[in-house]
């Protein structure tokens, strides 16, 4: 049995960790360096760091904060936000990231994914897709969930995987921050089309949501923010619960 992963996510804006609902109404949560240190000691399998307004504001990612975060942790770090070129990949990796998440940059220039996979290996390239239902179709959104690209999400994700994305982080805008469970319909639709690891993001509210998630084929990791940041659920408590219920975890 493949060990499943629990991944906390730091959404960073203006140097602070924030959290909202459905990608809006962002509230200040904490200092990202302190929070990274906490998760490193709390049993997280990996950490995701998103500079969530870099693409929308058309600027480079905050590398100073990223460097400090990377220096504090000893678990794999995935970083995204404002990644538009191979130079951006270089910059992020030199700051200490293990994997680079690309979203709006790939939508603008799809060739970025095969080029990055060729240079760094597909295990380094994570496709982050912000997906929402529009008129019964799963659609890809850009610029932090602000812009409907009109692209079919399932087709886009499959193309990216076929062209070098080694992992998919699927962010459901519909369930983001709502805490009623992961978007299993969307996750199943993607898992049926690709054969790379899938990280489920958006909707976690309780430990049972993760158990239900991991009963679905093709889902390798559960990502959450608010419930961990607010300590409504600790990662150790969650992993012990999952392990007791037949889901193999690294304890």
Regions found by a protein language model. Give the residues of each.
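Structural preference for beta-strand elements that scaffold enzyme active sites
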Residues: 5-9, 46, 74-78, 99-101, ...
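Short beta->alpha connector loops at strand-helix junctions that form conserved
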Residues: 81, 102-105, 225
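Catalytic cores of alpha/beta
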Residues: 73, 77-99, 185-221
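Conserved, mostly hydrophobic/aromatic
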Residues: 11, 39, 47, 79, ...
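N-terminal beta-alpha supersecondary unit
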Residues: 2, 16-60
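Active-site-adjacent beta->alpha loops and helix N-cap segments on the catalytic face
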Residues: 2, 6, 54-70, 84-90, ...
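Short, acidic/polar
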Residues: 28-40, 84-90, 149-159, 207-210
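Conserved anion-binding
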Residues: 12-14, 18-19, 97-170, 174-175
